[in-house]
Curated annotation (Swiss-Prot):
Keyword field: Amidation, Calcium channel impairing toxin, Cytolysis, Disulfide bond, Ion channel impairing toxin, Knottin, Membrane, Neurotoxin, Secreted, Signal, Target cell membrane, Target membrane, Toxin, Voltage-gated calcium channel impairing toxin
A GO CC annotation given for this chain: other organism cell membrane
GO terms, molecular function: calcium channel regulator activity; toxin activity
Subcellular compartments: Secreted; Target cell membrane
GO biological process: killing of cells of another organism
Expression tissues: Expressed by the venom gland.
Membrane in keyword set: yes
Coiled coil: none
Protein's name according to its UniProt entry: Toxin CSTX-10
Length: 116
């Protein structure tokens, strides 16, 4: 029964992650012109390079789509409001969301259960 519950939770998290990334990719660029295609391709080629991505807990304010990949999932850029004196600024960092942490924990428990 425990295995069934863990598998169901893991499947649900993976499915929701896949559908969220698909919607984000599909609806991200509403207007797309022919002049934009070459910079777009060059940008995507850079993102595939692991050395040029933004690591965990590093700032991603200017480049929100370039976070590195963690153990199972890609980190997500999460923004926070920082108040310095009376000035409020928006700062972003690459972090692992809570549901990704839960999925990684479920996978590690699942592996430990079937390792023996």
């Amino acid at each position: 029964m425990k295995v069934l519950v863990i598998f169901a939770v893991l499947s649900l998290v993976i499915f929701s992650n896949c559908s969220a990334e698909t919607d984000e990719d599909f609806f991200g660029e509403e207007s797309f012109e022919a002049d934009d295609i070459i910079p777009f391709i060059a940008k995507e080629q850079v993102r595939k390079d692991k050395e040029n991505c933004i690591g965990k807990h590093h700032e991603c304010t200017d480049d929100r789509d370039n976070c590195c990949k963690g153990k199972l999932f890609r980190y997500q850029c999460q923004c926070f409001k920082v108040i310095d004196g009376k000035k409020e600024t928006k700062r972003c960092a690459c972090v692992t969301p809570l549901h990704y942490k839960m999925a990684e924990m479920a996978v590690s428990v699942f592996k430990k259960m079937f390792k023996n």
